[in-house]
Amino acid sequence: MKCRPTLNTDQPRVRKKLPERFPKWLQRPLPQGSAFHATDATIKRSGMPTVCEEALCPNRAECWSRKTATYLALGDVCTRSCGFCNIGHSKTPPALDPTEPERIALSAKELGLKHVVITMVARDDLEDGGAQGLVDIIQKLREELPQATTEVLASDFQGNVSALHTLLDSGITIYNHNVETVARLSPLVRHKATYARSMFMLEQAANYLPDLKIKSGIMVGLGEMEGEVKQTLQDLASIGVRIVTIGQYLRPSRKHLQVKSYVTPETFDYYRRVGEAMGLFVYAGPFVRSSFNADMILASVQDKASA
């Protein structure tokens, strides 16, 4: 019969130190205050979803403290289920809400937005991918906020160029479509979307309206190589994209894609310099997202153009 080893109860128990969930550069205080709560109240009154909330954006507190928000248009149910995204999905989302344009416009007016950013769920169930729904929002914004600039982060409309032209003809200030990741990882990261089709749609926009400010963005930390990021920047620059955002991918839940690496601030700065050498305006950093500080990015691009 084996004897059970005697525990030495005189020795203090040593608790192993667990690794930090995030590196130090991803740890920051969450600003809140009267402006944050005022923005929160305005959003709640409008009944409109924001990508800030639906996508669990880490910048929500900071943006709302500045009285800025990004509206999620065409409902809050997406027809795609990308591995990085927290937004709900279904093959049969609800019909478009005819009150949505007015609610977005009045909410933006109450916040006093000078630059309004609209993003959308993919609506592959609609013939035009929701393009006309976006136009209706832009038109209502123009009625309520005639001096405001507008930015739309659109889906790829399944490659429907006619739908793209419908959106571009609305007179938006910035057309944004994210390629999201490098070419090799696109099949893993994105659902029903391809790197080639995203590049095609961005190039079509640049050819259709050469003076339009065209923007795209990628996430890093998904397993990409440095050379692949540089190639993506080169691909974007070669087709007429002028603005690129680069941010750290953060896993919304255990059901989503794993983070492969935490990219250092120094590496983000390196990517910025690489992109700028290609003629791009690059906004890069751990917390950067497509719509983060979008008003400041536009102002910087305009200042650079007029210099």
Curated annotation (Swiss-Prot):
Gene Ontology CC annotation, any one: cytoplasm
SUPFAM superfamilies attached to this UniProt entry: Radical SAM enzymes
Main location: cytoplasm
Domain of life: Bacteria
Cofactor: [4Fe-4S] cluster
SMART domains, per database record: Elp3 (SM00729)
Binding residues for [4Fe-4S] cluster 2: 78, 82, 85
Residue span(s) of domain Radical SAM core: 64-281
Gene3D superfamilies associated with the record: Aldolase class I
Residue numbers binding [4Fe-4S] cluster 1: 52, 57, 63, 291
Cofactor descriptive note: Binds 2 [4Fe-4S] clusters per subunit. One cluster is coordinated with 3 cysteines and an exchangeable S-adenosyl-L-methionine.
Cross-referenced PROSITE patterns: RADICAL_SAM
Key words of the record: 4Fe-4S, Cytoplasm, Iron, Iron-sulfur, Metal-binding, S-adenosyl-L-methionine, Transferase
Cell location: Cytoplasm
Pathway note: Protein modification; protein lipoylation via endogenous pathway; protein N(6)-(lipoyl)lysine from octanoyl-[acyl-carrier-protein]: step 2/2
MF GO annotations: 4 iron, 4 sulfur cluster binding; lipoate synthase activity; metal ion binding
EC number(s) stated in the UniProt entry for this protein: 2.8.1.8
UniProt keyword annotation of Acyltransferase present: no
Cleavable signal peptide: none
InterPro entries, alphabetized: Aldolase_TIM (IPR013785), Elp3/MiaA/NifB-like_rSAM (IPR006638), Lipoyl_synth (IPR003698), rSAM (IPR007197)
Enzyme class: transferase
UniProt family annotation: Belongs to the radical SAM superfamily. Lipoyl synthase family.
Protein name as annotated: Lipoyl synthase
